C-alpha cells in the first residue's frame, strides 16, 4: 500500500517519513503554563530537528466526575491557541466534542481531533469533514484496528481525505488498557499516517475514585515499542508538575525529561525506518 502524505502546515506526516511530534499538555490549565510548555517543546524539538505540532484541549468533556476541571472553554481556548501560533509559529492540534465546535476551531488550529469515545458519531464526523481541516482520528478503546476503515470511509464520503489515524490502547478487562503492536501495521495498510498516543495508552481508566490512574513509569518502554513500528508520529502529553496536574497527571511525562525522552524516540524511529522491508506474504 502506497503511504499517503498529509500536510500539516509545512510538515509532511507519513509513515515512511521521519516522525512528527504531536505534543504538549492534556488540557489548558492557564495561559502562562501553556506558554511555558510550548516553549519547552519548541526548544527540545528544534535542538533534535523533530517536526512539531502543539497539542492541548480547551475542554475535557468526558471527565469521570462532574466536578473535575474541564478547561477554559472554546472562546478562551482559541484565544490562547492564537497567541501560541503568533508567538511560536507552530501548528496546533486540539479536539472537538460537538458538531457546532468544528468550524470555529478549524479556523484557528491546523488539526482537529475526533475523540476516541466519539469516533463513531456520524454527525460529528460530518461536521469535522466539512471544515476540510486535517483530522486526527483517535481509535476508540472498543474498536479493532481494522474497524478504522469504516471511520475513514465516513470522512471520505463526507468529502475529507486529510486523515491521520491514532492508536491509544484497547480495553483489557476493567480499568486497564493494552496496546496491540500488530494493530499499527493493520492501520498502516490503509495508507494513512498512523501516530501513537503513548500517554493515554498508559491510562488505567476509572482506577481512582473519581478519575483515571496511569503508569507514567513505563512511558519510555511503551514509547520505544511504538516507535519501533515505523509510524508517522508520536502523540505525547507533559506537565511541569504531574502530581498536581488537573487532568491525567499519572500519565504525563515530567516536562524536564522531555528532551532526553525525545532523543531516544528519535533514535528508535531512525533505526526502525532504516531496515529493508521483508515481504512475508
Curated annotation (Swiss-Prot):
Catalytic activity: D-arabinose 5-phosphate + phosphoenolpyruvate + H2O = 3-deoxy-alpha-D-manno-2-octulosonate-8-phosphate + phosphate
Catalytic EC class: transferase
One Pfam family in the UniProt entry: DAHP_synth_1
InterPro entries: Aldolase_TIM, DAHP1/KDSA, KDO8P_synthase
Keyword line: Cytoplasm, Lipopolysaccharide biosynthesis, Transferase
Gene3D superfamilies per UniProt: Aldolase class I (3.20.20.70)
Pathway membership: Carbohydrate biosynthesis; 3-deoxy-D-manno-octulosonate biosynthesis; 3-deoxy-D-manno-octulosonate from D-ribulose 5-phosphate: step 2/3; Bacterial outer membrane biogenesis; lipopolysaccharide biosynthesis
Presence of keyword 4Fe-4S: no
MF terms in GO: 3-deoxy-8-phosphooctulonate synthase activity
Residue stretches spanning the membrane: none
Family in the record: Belongs to the KdsA family.
Protein name: 2-dehydro-3-deoxyphosphooctonate aldolase
UniProt organism field: Psychromonas ingrahamii (strain DSM 17664 / CCUG 51855 / 37)
Gene that this sequence comes from: kdsA
Amino acid at each position: 500500500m502506497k503511504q499517503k502524505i498529509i500536510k500539516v502546515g509545512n510538515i509532511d506526516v507519513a509513515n515512511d517519513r521521519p516522525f512528527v511530534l504531536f505534543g504538549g499538555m492534556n488540557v489548558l490549565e492557564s495561559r502562562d503554563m501553556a506558554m511555558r510548555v510550548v516553549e519547552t517543546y519548541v526548544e527540545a524539538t528544534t535542538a533534535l530537528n523533530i517536526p512539531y505540532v502543539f497539542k492541548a484541549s480547551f475542554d475535557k468533556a468526558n471527565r469521570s466526575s462532574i466536578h473535575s476541571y474541564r478547561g477554559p472553554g472554546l472562546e478562551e481556548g482559541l484565544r490562547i491557541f492564537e497567541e501560541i501560533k503568533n508567538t511560536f509559529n507552530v501548528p496546533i492540534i486540539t479536539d472537538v466534542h460537538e458538531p457546532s465546535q468544528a468550524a470555529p476551531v478549524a479556523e484557528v488550529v491546523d488539526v482537529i481531533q475526533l475523540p476516541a469515545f466519539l469516533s463513531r458519531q456520524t454527525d460529528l464526523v460530518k461536521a469535522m469533514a466539512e471544515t476540510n481541516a486535517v483530522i486526527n482520528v483517535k481509535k476508540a478503546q472498543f474498536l479493532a484496528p481494522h474497524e478504522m476503515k469504516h471511520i475513514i470511509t465516513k470522512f471520505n464520503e463526507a468529502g475529507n481525505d486529510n486523515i491521520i489515524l491514532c492508536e491509544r490502547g484497547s480495553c483489557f478487562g476493567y480499568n486497564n488498557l493494552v496496546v496491540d503492536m500488530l494493530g499499527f501495521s493493520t492501520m498502516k495498510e490503509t495508507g494513512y499516517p498512523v501516530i501513537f498516543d503513548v500517554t493515554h495508552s498508559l491510562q488505567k481508566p476509572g482506577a481512582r475514585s473519581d478519575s483515571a490512574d496511569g503508569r507514567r513509569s513505563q512511558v519510555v518502554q511503551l514509547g520505544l515499542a511504538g516507535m519501533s513500528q515505523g509510524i508517522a508520529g508520536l502523540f505525547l502529553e507533559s506537565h511541569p508538575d504531574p502530581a498536581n496536574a488537573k487532568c491525567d497527571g499519572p500519565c504525563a511525562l515530567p516536562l524536564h525529561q522531555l528532551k532526553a525522552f525525545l532523543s531516544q524516540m528519535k533514535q528508535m524511529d531512525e533505526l526502525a525506518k532504516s531496515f529493508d522491508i521483508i515481504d512475508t506474504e
